[in-house]
Amino acid sequence: MNRPKLLWLQSISCNGNAHSFFNHPNFFLIMSHFKLIYHPLLDTDYTLIDLYNNKLDCDILILEGSFKKELIKHDIDIYALIQSYADRAKWIITAGTCATFGGVFKQNEPESISGFCFDIEEKRNNYKKYAHKLISLPGCPIHPKWLSFVLLMLAKDKKIPIDEFHRPQELYGITVHTGCSRSEYFEWKIDTKGFGFKEGCLFYENGCQAPFTRGSCNKILWNDVSSKTIVGTPCFGCTEPDFPKNTLFTTKTNMGIPAKMPLGIPMRAYLTATGIAKSFKIKRLEERVIEYDSKKTN
């Protein structure tokens, strides 16, 4: 059985998505299903110069980093090189928010930097050309198991249902709030007392974007054990087109009400539920989960 040929190319990148994937607990097993043609951080049979001089066969093209026309690396027009292999590849995966929507680097040159097929939410001119083989995996960085899921699905020639931004619905069909260990505090409108606490919700005052950010971070945990909200840090909304926002640790409010509602929830319904929840005082939820200073502890 011929293994699919895999090619990983970078544009303007911090290498974060590559390093995240390297930390997959089954990285070598996953890669054994593919023939790696080139990766900028790994030893491979071909160099970037080889890719430029020889039009090699490519089944799956993984793109990392934001895109800018006429970007030169090692005297090679990287954007032109990427386009040539995008034409040849059977599948294109944009790994990370930068490659998908523009991400952090777009903040530096908003007019000239974008994702490969999307410029924030807008479709670029090349969208129609590549839409039939495009899979978007935004994240800053990408979760390693999201990428392994897509790679193995493609290797087995399985269909991957996608949303309007070509994100796999299996991974992005829910919000980051789904599975959050703080959901009970969210339901009863109990704020956290600060970052790093196990108790309280981070949505109301501390900028958590999990209720309107698509992703499975609280279902498929990082390192199999944790997530931002579990450790007491707000979700930054890194899988969405408009990441990064200007305020990451503060919730924008209008008259004390979060300016942005949870995904699909009308404001009237939210205000009604909030009014009911705040009329009750749940003693258990006002207490510490673990009393570290208690005399009962050993």
What positions do the PLM features span?
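Iron-sulfur (Fe-S) cluster-binding modules
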Residues: 1-62, 83-89, 130-136, 149-298
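Short active-site-adjacent helix-start/loop capping segments
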Residues: 15-16, 44-47, 69-72, 101-103
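Short acidic, glycine/serine/threonine-rich loops at helix termini
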Residues: 18-20, 74, 103-109, 148-150
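A generic local structural motif
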Residues: 46-50, 78-81, 121-124
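Cofactor-cradling patches in redox/metallo enzymes
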Residues: 56-87, 93, 97, 103-106
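Short, amphipathic alpha-helical segments
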Residues: 76-79, 137-141, 145
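Catalytic metal-binding/acid-base residues of hydrolase active sites
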Residues: 98-99, 142
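Class I SAM-dependent methyltransferase SAM-binding "motif I" and its flanking Rossmann-like core
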Residues: 103-130, 135-139
